[in-house]
A protein has these predicted regions:
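Hydrophobic micro-sites
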Residues: 182-232
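Helical hairpin unit composed of two closely spaced alpha helices linked by a short loop
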Residues: 59-65
Length: 232
């Protein structure tokens, strides 16, 4: 659900804006232009987070590129109800240009869907063309948000995490277990990923706490809350 667009005054929309602000503040010592969103496993809400974060950044006046880098099971196009006939995979394969494949959803938000599912997603995402594409995008957009596959499922997020400035890990209390979340964190740390924070979804708000273990919690509706690391 695109709550930032459909319910702009809801608590959860404000939570995404807070996440946006925290990411911006985390760039005080280092540029935080390329941001990877992933999860430990499927169904945890990483694509929903990517889309709403992109909307929140765009509404603040920043130029944003949202990339669907889940070349195995893309979903960004479904959330925005746009075509996925051509996209990132086609651009990287040299079949089309970015300008022809991208969609300007609003004045500040540009979306590049995943495109045709390739036979070699990991190789495509780790290619020199992908690195060159991201480098070119940095010269055009203030923020580039990459919606990546789940960490434990495939190696794609680990590959992409070496190309970005920061990683946000999405974890669902109703889907992921503690060990899966820990394993995802370990896999990212093994490639020296810069994990700047996490988003915790589907939480029982009856047992919520304002502070816990060095994390801030931001509560929203529909049993969802966003959590962000304190200063590291």
């Amino acid at each position: 659900m695109l709550v930032v667009k459909d319910k702009p005054k809801s608590p959860i929309s404000e939570a995404y804006r807070t996440l946006r602000s925290n990411i911006q503040f985390s760039s005080f010592d280092k540029d935080m232009q390329l941001i990877l969103i992933t999860s430990s496993g499927p169904g945890e809400g990483k694509s929903t987070t990517s889309c709403n974060l992109a909307l929140a950044m765009a509404e603040a006046g920043s130029s944003v590129l949202l990339l669907d880098c889940d070349l195995r099971k893309p979903s960004v196009h479904k959330k925005f109800k746009i075509s996925n006939n051509i996209g990132l995979s086609n651009v990287l394969a040299g079949q089309t240009k970015f300008e022809s494949a991208s969609h300007w959803y609003s004045q500040n938000l540009c979306i590049l869907t995943a495109g045709k599912i390739p036979p070699n997603p990991a190789e495509m995402l780790s290619s020199k063309r992908m690195k060159a594409f991201l480098n070119e995008a940095k010269g055009v957009f203030k923020y580039i948000i990459l919606d990546a596959p789940p960490v434990i499922a495939v190696t794609d997020p680990q590959i992409l995490s070496t190309m970005v400035d920061g990683v946000v890990l999405v974890v669902s209390s109703g889907v992921a277990d503690i060990e899966a979340a820990k394993r995802a964190k370990e896999l990212l740390e093994n490639v020296n990923a810069n994990i700047i924070g996490s988003v915790l979804n589907r939480v029982d708000t009856e047992s919520r706490r304002g502070y816990y273990g060095g994390y801030y919690y931001y509560y929203g509706d529909e049993g969802e809350k966003v959590k962000k690391h304190k200063d590291r």
